[in-house]
């Protein structure tokens, strides 16, 4: 039998899709890239914004038209968690709904009709941390915590993924060793507040924090690089930043989700920090790691965001000069504090602000790309580049998170670390050639 999975949203969803495939493989399901041939179609959903939810029902309609007569459609993930049985009412072609914290129950629901499994067990002793068989990969996703205890006014994630619990370190290290033995060179650690690791376990464990975990993972033979997402700026204290800077296996790229450059808006968002505090953390980080790559999230048009508030955001953009920007217009979500507010920034104003923000960021990327020419980076080979069935090079990421396209005549295998020199750029993209390998 064949299964097709459509994955929306974040890296956590990608990891959950891997888990779904692993569970289904025990029932002799094989993954297919063609939904028309599938016996089971799964849509793993995102609910951070309204747009992916609208897309969900469009996707369901399309799959219902092209699927095999007896094929089933299942909806999984965060939208499944908060909409539950309402999905079955709105889309009768859906056979079952499986919440974000119920992935391991896939084998129990695929043979049922109109099944709904979305409840989260909030008894901490009942949490089970099951790892699963994964395909051999150069880069592997690894959960280190589940859920979120933050109360950001705009965010539905605490409702859909439940309380924040850290996975015991010994289980994480055991899984990381298995991945390394299976060929993994780079780990991507996952958690809703990944750098708050160790704040709460499901039972008694030795006191450890995120930096302790990074140090232990770095000792595993075969693991060359470690990345993580998504951290919270509040937990980027001096101690963490210093250990981040010193650990040679921890990639010198970091996600620092700003959300807004206005202290007033940040207070309304319940983020727990100010514009000045955020800039202080960036300044400290750059003092320790001058070449660090920084990515961020920014929401424009949050309720009551004024022109001055937006200008504060633009000011932070200019000062930090982020390497990657994920930016969106505010989207009201159910089960959130801000979702109940009546105040709204007009869509045309929000759209104008978003366009200005994104256009300026594109200019910043081009300015930064010019400065990269002549610099060297060590790239982890991810994919080979081919032209007319001939290998012409490879592509991969630097330690600082830069995606680089490399031209070379020698054959380079995925997983190799290769020194390259940047020779040109185009629209923020970096091109390189091998150097002294």
Swiss-Prot record:
The keyword Metal-binding applies. The keyword Transferase applies. InterPro entries: Elp3/MiaA/NifB-like_rSAM (IPR006638), Methylthiotransferase (IPR005839), Methylthiotransferase_CS (IPR020612), Methylthiotransferase_N (IPR013848), Methylthiotransferase_N_sf (IPR038135), MiaB_methiolase (IPR006463), rSAM (IPR007197), rSAM_horseshoe (IPR023404). Binds 2 [4Fe-4S] clusters. One cluster is coordinated with 3 cysteines and an exchangeable S-adenosyl-L-methionine. [4Fe-4S] cluster 1 binds at residues 10, 46, 78. GO terms for molecular function: 4 iron, 4 sulfur cluster binding; metal ion binding; N6-isopentenyladenosine methylthiotransferase activity. Keywords: 4Fe-4S, Cytoplasm, Iron, Iron-sulfur, Metal-binding, S-adenosyl-L-methionine, Transferase, tRNA processing. It is an enzyme of class 2 (transferase). It holds the Pfam family Radical_SAM. One of its GO terms (biological process) is tRNA methylthiolation. This is tRNA-2-methylthio-N(6)-dimethylallyladenosine synthase. Belongs to the methylthiotransferase family. MiaB subfamily. [4Fe-4S] cluster 2 binds at residues 148, 152, 155. Residues 370-436 form the TRAM domain. Residues 134-367 form the Radical SAM core domain. The gene is miaB. It catalyses: N(6)-dimethylallyladenosine(37) in tRNA + (sulfur carrier)-SH + AH2 + 2 S-adenosyl-L-methionine = 2-methylsulfanyl-N(6)-dimethylallyladenosine(37) in tRNA + (sulfur carrier)-H + 5'-deoxyadenosine + L-methionine + A + S-adenosyl-L-homocysteine + 2 H(+). Monomer. Its cofactor is [4Fe-4S] cluster. Its EC number is 2.8.4.3.
């Amino acid at each position: 039998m064949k299964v097709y999975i459509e994955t929306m949203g974040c890296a956590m969803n990608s990891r959950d899709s891997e888990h779904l495939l692993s569970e289904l493989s025990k029932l002799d399901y094989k993954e297919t890239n063609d939904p028309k041939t599938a016996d089971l179609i799964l849509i793993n959903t995102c609910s951070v914004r309204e747009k992916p939810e609208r897309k969900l029902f469009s996707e369901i309609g399309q799959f219902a038209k092209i699927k095999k007569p007896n094929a089933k459609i299942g909806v999984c993930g965060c939208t499944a968690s908060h909409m539950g049985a309402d999905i079955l009412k709105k889309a009768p072609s859906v056979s079952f709904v499986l919440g974000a914290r119920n992935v391991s129950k896939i084998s129990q629901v695929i043979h049922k009709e109109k099944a709904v499994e979305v409840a989260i067990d909030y008894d901490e002793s009942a949490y089970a941390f099951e790892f699963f068989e994964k395909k051999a990969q150069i880069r592997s996703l690894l959960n280190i915590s589940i859920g979120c205890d933050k109360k950001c006014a705009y965010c539905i994630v605490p409702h859909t993924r439940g309380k924040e619990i850290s996975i015991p370190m010994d289980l994480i290290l055991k899984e990381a060793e298995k991945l390394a033995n299976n060929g993994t060179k780079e780990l991507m650690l996952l958690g809703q507040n990944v750098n708050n690791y160790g704040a709460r376990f499901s039972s008694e464990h030795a006191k450890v924090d995120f930096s302790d975990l990074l140090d232990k993972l770095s000792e595993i033979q075969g693991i060359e690089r470690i990345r993580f997402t998504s951290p919270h700026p509040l937990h980027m204290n001096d101690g963490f930043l210093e250990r981040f800077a010193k650990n040679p296996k921890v990639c010198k790229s970091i996600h620092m989700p700003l959300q807004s450059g206005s202290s007033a808006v940040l207070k309304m968002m319940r983020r727990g920090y100010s514009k000045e505090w955020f800039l202080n953390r960036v300044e400290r980080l750059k003092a320790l790691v001058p070449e660090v790559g920084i990515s961020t999230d920014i929401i424009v048009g949050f309720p009551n965001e004024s022109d001055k508030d937006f200008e504060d955001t633009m000011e932070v953009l200019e000062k930090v000069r982020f390497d990657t920007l994920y930016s969106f217009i505010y989207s009201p979500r159910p089960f959130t504090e801000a979702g109940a507010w009546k105040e709204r920034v007009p869509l045309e104003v929000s759209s104008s602000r978003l366009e200005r923000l994104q256009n300026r960021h594109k200019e910043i990327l081009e300015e930064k790309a010019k400065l990269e020419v002549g610099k060297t980076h060590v790239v982890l080979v991810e994919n080979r580049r081919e032209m007319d069935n001939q290998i012409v090079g490879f592509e991969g990421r630097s330690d600082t998170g830069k995606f680089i396209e490399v031209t070379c005549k020698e054959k380079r295998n995925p997983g190799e670390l290769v020194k390259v020199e940047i020779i040109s750029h185009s629209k923020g993209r970096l091109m390189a050639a091998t150097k002294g390998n």
